[in-house]
Design a protein with these regions (language model features):
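A short beta-turn/strand-edge loop motif at beta-sheet boundaries
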Residues: 59-66
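C-terminal segment of classical bacterial N-terminal signal peptides
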Residues: 17-25
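Enriched for extracellular/lumenal, surface-exposed ectodomains of secreted and cell-surface proteins
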Residues: 106-134, 138
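Exposed aromatic-hydrophobic patches
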Residues: 54, 94-103
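Solvent-exposed serine/threonine-rich low-complexity stretches and specific carbohydrate-binding patches
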Residues: 80-92, 100-101
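Structural beta-strand segments of beta-rich domains
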Residues: 49-53
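Short, compositionally biased P/S/T/A/G/V-rich stretches that sit at domain boundaries
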Residues: 27-48, 139-140
Length: 140
């Protein structure tokens, strides 16, 4: 009788573990990659240090609207030095950001990039994504 009770207890424990593993996979959701792209001619730098960028998100349609967008200055190692602007994408995944470059930046060593933040949309996990870094041109 003790053997039957142990076997039953073991089966219940195994069933609970399987159910837990299945639930964890369901909660994790389906991951969707995000690629941040610039429109042609973007970003634009002017002589006074103002920079503007426009573009869109290449991702699943459910992940396009209301994504947090950050316009960042990064150094040669990819470390964020400053955040120039923040906004959200529109319903089509388009975004527009602008900001003033810090005056203390050494010429030719830094870049700007745009980052889309991570977001959950229903059963989907919209992963964070970044644009290709664009070198800040030397001041003329």
């Amino acid at each position: 009788m003790r053997t039957a009770a142990k076997a039953t207890l073991a089966l219940v424990a195994i069933a609970a573990l399987c159910l837990g593993a299945f639930s964890a996979a369901a909660v994790a959701g389906k991951k969707k990659k995000t690629v941040v792209v610039y429109f042609s001619g973007s970003p634009k730098f002017n002589k006074s240090g103002k920079v503007t960028a426009k573009g869109s998100l290449n991702t699943a349609s459910v992940c396009k609207p209301s994504r947090g967008m950050r316009f960042q200055v990064i150094d040669v190692n990819g470390t964020v030095i400053a955040t120039l602007d923040g906004s959200t994408s529109d319903s089509s995944g388009n975004w527009s950001l602008s900001g003033q470059l810090p005056s203390s930046l050494p010429a030719g060593t830094n870049s700007v990039r745009v980052k889309a933040t991570k977001r959950t949309a229903g059963k989907f996990v919209c992963q964070a994504g970044v644009s290709t870094p664009v070198a800040i041109p030397p001041a003329t």
